[in-house]
From Swiss-Prot:
Organism field: Oryza sativa subsp. japonica (Rice)
Gene Ontology MF terms in the entry: cyclin-dependent protein serine/threonine kinase regulator activity
Family: Belongs to the cyclin family. Cyclin D subfamily.
GO terms under cellular component: cyclin-dependent protein kinase holoenzyme complex; cytoplasm; nucleus
Transmembrane segments: none
Family matches, as Gene3D superfamilies: Cyclin-like
Pfam assignment, any one: Cyclin_N
Name listed for the protein in its UniProt record: Cyclin-D3-2
Region Disordered, annotated ranges: 331-364
Length: 364
C-alpha cells in the first residue's frame, strides 16, 4: 500500500465520459486546489534594490576607445550594425532587453578590441547576426533559425541586403563573440536598473523608457556612458510623459545613484534626439527613426561565407564550403542579388580553401 502511494503523483485523473456525471464536485475540487496553490514569489523589495544597484554599478565598464582605436572603423559602420540588430529584434518581436544585450555584445567585441573590420567591413553585419542570435538564446523562449532571422531583418529595397550568411559561418562568429565576452552573457544594461525599479506597477513608463533608449542605441555616444547614467536619464526624460516627477523620481534617481554630470549629459542627448524627431514628425523609437541607418554602410565584395538569399533555398548551396570565411577577399564586385541568385549557380569552392589565417585573434 505504501509502495503504491509513491506513484500516486504520476497518475492523471481521467475525464468522465458518461453524460450524467455531476461536475459540481469537480468544480469544488478545482477551487480547493486553487486556494491551496503556493503563492507566487514576492517582487523585489525596496530594501534589496540598494544592494542590487551597488553590485550593478561595480560591474559597469563604459567603453571609451580613442578615435583611432574604434574597431568598427567609423561611426557609420557602428550605426549600420546596431541598426540592423535593432531592426531584427523589432521584426521578430523580441524584448527590449534582447536588443540591449545584442548591442552590448557588439560594442564589447568591436570597441573592446577583440574584432576589427579592417578590409572586411562585412564582418560587422556577420557579428550583428551572431549577437542577435546569442541574445535571443539568452533572453527569449522561442528562437528562429538563423536563415529566418536574417531574412526577417532584410530591407528589400537595399541592394546590400540581398545576401545572408550560412549557418556554419554564423556559429563560428558566435564562438568568437563568446570568447570576446569571456562567456559572460549578462552585461549590465540600462534595463538592469529600470526593470526592477519600475516593474509591472509602472509598465507604461517602462515602455516609454525602453522606446527612448532603443532610439539612441545606434548613436555613437551610447557606449561612451554608463548604463546607470542612461537609466537615470530615461527616467528624467519620461517624467513629463507619464506624470512622474517630484519626490518619487528623486527617490528613484537616488537609488540608481548615477554620476550627476554623466546623467545630465545623457539627458541632454535624449532631449536633442526627441527634439529632432519631433521636428521631423517621427516618434522616438518608431520604425522610421533609423530607417536609413543600414544604407549608410555599403559592403564591398562578399566573403566566401556569404550566399545569395535565393540560393539559400537551393540544395546546392548547402554543400558550399564556409571554412574560408576570413580568407582573402574576392575581387571587388557586387553581392549576389536576389533575382540573379535564382538564375545563377555559384561554383563550389575548392576543397583547399579552408584557411584560418585571416581569422581575427581571440580576446586574451
Amino acid at each position: 500500500m505504501a509502495f503504491a502511494t509513491l506513484f500516486d503523483s504520476l497518475y492523471c485523473p481521467e475525464e468522465h465520459l458518461d453524460l450524467f456525471h455531476d461536475t459540481a464536485a469537480d468544480d469544488d475540487l478545482h477551487l480547493d486546489l486553487h486556494l491551496h496553490q503556493p503563492p507566487p514569489p514576492p517582487p523585489l523589495l525596496d530594501d534589496d534594490l540598494p544592494a542590487l544597484f551597488h553590485a550593478l554599478r561595480g560591474k559597469e565598464d563604459p567603453l571609451r576607445p580613442a578615435a583611432d582605436d574604434d574597431g568598427y572603423g567609423g561611426v557609420s559602420a557602428r550605426e549600420a550594425a546596431v541598426g540592423w540588430a535593432l531592426r531584427a529584434v523589432a521584426r521578430l518581436g523580441f524584448s527590449a532587453l534582447t536588443a540591449a544585450l545584442a548591442v552590448a555584445y557588439l560594442d564589447r567585441c568591436f570597441l573592446g578590441g577583440a574584432l576589427r573590420l579592417g578590409d572586411r567591413p562585412w564582418m560587422a553585419r556577420l557579428a550583428a547576426v551572431a549577437c542577435v542570435a546569442l541574445a535571443a538564446k539568452v533572453e527569449e523562449t522561442r528562437v528562429p533559425v538563423l536563415l529566418d532571422l536574417q531574412l526577417c531583418a532584410a530591407e528589400r529595397a537595399d541592394p546590400n541586403e540581398a545576401y545572408v550568411f550560412e549557418d556554419k559561418t554564423v556559429r563560428r562568429m558566435e564562438l568568437l563573440v563568446l570568447s570576446a565576452l569571456g562567456w559572460r552573457m549578462h552585461p549590465v544594461t540600462p534595463l538592469s536598473y529600470l526593470q526592477p525599479l519600475l516593474g509591472t506597477a509602472h509598465a507604461a513608463r517602462l515602455h516609454h523608457c525602453d522606446t527612448a533608449l532603443l532610439a539612441l542605441m545606434p548613436d555613437w555616444r551610447w557606449p561612451r556612458h554608463r548604463p546607470s547614467a542612461w537609466a537615470a536619464a530615461a527616467l528624467l526624460a519620461t517624467a513629463g510623459w507619464c506624470g512622474g516627477g517630484g519626490g518619487d523620481d528623486a527617490e528613484l534617481l537616488a537609488l540608481i545613484d548615477a554620476p550627476k554630470d554623466e546623467m545630465a549629459e545623457c539627458a541632454k542627448i535624449i532631449s536633442e534626439e526627441a527634439a529632432a524627431a519631433a521636428a521631423g514628425g517621427i516618434v522616438i523609437g518608431g520604425e522610421n527613426k533609423r530607417k536609413g541607418a543600414a544604407g549608410l554602410y555599403s559592403a564591398p565584395a562578399s566573403p566566401s561565407g556569404v550566399i545569395g538569399a535565393s540560393a539559400c533555398f537551393s540544395c546546392d548551396s548547402s554543400s558550399s564550403s564556409v571554412d574560408s570565411l576570413f580568407a582573402a577577399l574576392e575581387p571587388p564586385g557586387r553581392p549576389i542579388k536576389r533575382g540573379a541568385a535564382a538564375a545563377t549557380t555559384a561554383d563550389p569552392l575548392p576543397a583547399d580553401e579552408e584557411s584560418r589565417d585571416a581569422w581575427p585573434p581571440y580576446a586574451a
